[in-house]
């Protein structure tokens, strides 16, 4: 409790505009809680990143845990936090928000950085891994599980060759008390015991098995599994576990691979990669948490401390130069995070006839909206619709980009299916409509052979356009 009260005391209630000017149009990126903007300290003209959250207990917990960890050189620093009322253009009145001023990270995300280095070597991958591991160790020594370790949350300080990499976004971090029952995950980075915890949790809720006094839980070791996946992708350019069918939920074949730890080191990409690197991956991707390397074991591993040159150029750099590949790995998987989480709080829905929300009341009176009609769209109440629309577009990218188990009619049919869903939720998008027309789309499927990489790249542009449009409302 004292930590929470100390954190509350550190939050300023004066207006942030007294000390900072905010560029509301320049966005550094978009996370699950909205875009990160640029702000400038008036007294020094120094640029910082500004994250804005609704002032709720969950947001205060995120700030508290991040502040606890932020003293480490490989974790993004929090400069200061303001509690102000902010009214965005789409809102009828101001709302209490936390404005988190953080150090500016100019060097970009991990995969973007790798894509810019045509000669990204195994030694560089080892050095990046060591920095990530040091950040994790700091969190774990404080008994904090990050629970969201993925490439998008690993940022470089600047564009210099020796720029440090730093861990950010503590939105799903928790104190590890052995009771982390709510699985939080992105499919390609999810540990097997997270899936087992989810399976048992769902069965208990359904009354299939009695609730155990000592429920199956998962803990900090899941961060280490995620680290193993990130190392694998850094080394070769694709994830160790993937599915023959791509969707926003984890298919059975992918779930089976994760639960059994079934992955390989294909000769084409891995022949020049050291046995030390393969060894650390194997030891991190152990299915049983007790057999997995600890964070100290990672830091002591020969691969992170080798005096060998390890100057072999990795295939990942070449693969990630293709924007469509990066889109496939990052957008179709990691950016699906917000839509794939099982929320910590249970949500109960009121019957429509008793709802007080004026937007929903109006929709009820209007009934089903006619095709191509215009209807009132509220930014917050419409966020779920927008998320679904973006999900469907990301499913198209996943189907286009990820390795296919087989070619031919089945894969073509699957692409047609995911595109039908994407079109259903994005009919108003002119760019998508024009794209489908140019790709010979007849409303049910593509009549000509599709250049999947080109389609993925255009759909990525559609996502960016739709995201920008929704944020400006």
From Swiss-Prot:
Gene3D superfamilies: MAP kinase activated protein kinase 2, Phosphorylase Kinase, domain 1, Transferase(Phosphotransferase) domain 1. It comes from the Eukaryota. The keyword Phosphoprotein applies. Its main location: cytoplasm. SMART domains: S_TKc. Pfam families: Pkinase. ATP binds at residues 28-36, 51. It is found in: Cytoplasm; Nucleus. Residues 22-304 form the Protein kinase domain. Changing residue 337 to G: Induces constitutive protein kinase activity. It is linked to Neurocardiofaciodigital syndrome: An autosomal recessive syndrome characterized by severe developmental delay, variable brain anomalies, congenital heart defects, dysmorphic facial features, and a distinctive type of synpolydactyly with a supernumerary hypoplastic digit between the fourth and fifth digits of the hands and/or feet. Other features include eye abnormalities, hearing impairment, and electroencephalogram anomalies. Interacts with ERK3/MAPK6 and ERK4/MAPK4 (via FRIEDE motif); the interaction is direct. Interacts with YWHAE; the interaction prevents phosphorylation of HSP27/HSPB1 leading to disrupt F-actin polymerization. Interacts with SQSTM1. This is MAP kinase-activated protein kinase 5. The gene is MAPKAPK5.
